Amino acid sequence: DQGYENGYTDRILDTLKEKNVKTVFFVTGPYLEKNDRLIRRFVDEGHYVGNHTVRHKSMPLLSRAEAEKELLELEKAFEEKYNAQMLFFRPPMGEYNEETLKIAKELRYTTMFWSFAYDDWLKDKVRGPEYVVNLVSQNAHNGMIILFHAVSPDNAKALGSVIDTLRGMGYEFGDPIELYKP
């Protein structure tokens, strides 16, 4: 998730490129406005850019019109600037209801949740890359979708080892779109 930039995204992108792994970067409106160079790297290096809404508000608390505006405003700004589509939506904070899912589907989004996450958005809570590698590997499972926030120094340092460890356990990293094919 890319709510704001903390200086680790280039390292994350370098690791993903080195390990030949594609991912989805979920961005908000402020991130889109302030991080053109990084978003260009996302697109140019073959990653997906997902819709995390303009203002990162709890979707169930919004009216239908407000929820649609949150998605469509960001989508329009992204598509106009980068000539690419947003295919995935992740509800801010994971908060959603049936109406949220219905709106996203009507706007032709695939809603992507996660099957593993931890409190890595707390950027001052540093536990070291070994902690991340151990936590991910202990929770590894088929079809795993890992939610990492790019603001974490631990994630940036651990990513290469996480990929290597999971591959060593027999897991493969696929194109995110493949997870949603019928």
Task: Set out the residue ranges of the language-model regions.
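Divalent metal-coordination and catalytic microenvironments
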Residues: 1, 16, 49, 89-92, ...
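Active-site beta->alpha N-cap acidic-glycine motif
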Residues: 1-62, 66-86, 172, 178-181
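Alpha-helical scaffold elements lining the catalytic groove of polysaccharide deacetylases
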Residues: 6-11, 57-85, 95-142, 155-161
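Terminal accessory/targeting
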Residues: 14-23, 142-182
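A generic structural signal for well-ordered alpha-helical segments
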Residues: 16, 42, 104-107, 166
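Short, solvent-exposed turn/loop segments enriched in Gly/Ser/Thr/Pro and often Arg
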Residues: 28, 90-97
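Histidine-centered catalytic micro-motifs
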Residues: 48-55, 94, 148-151
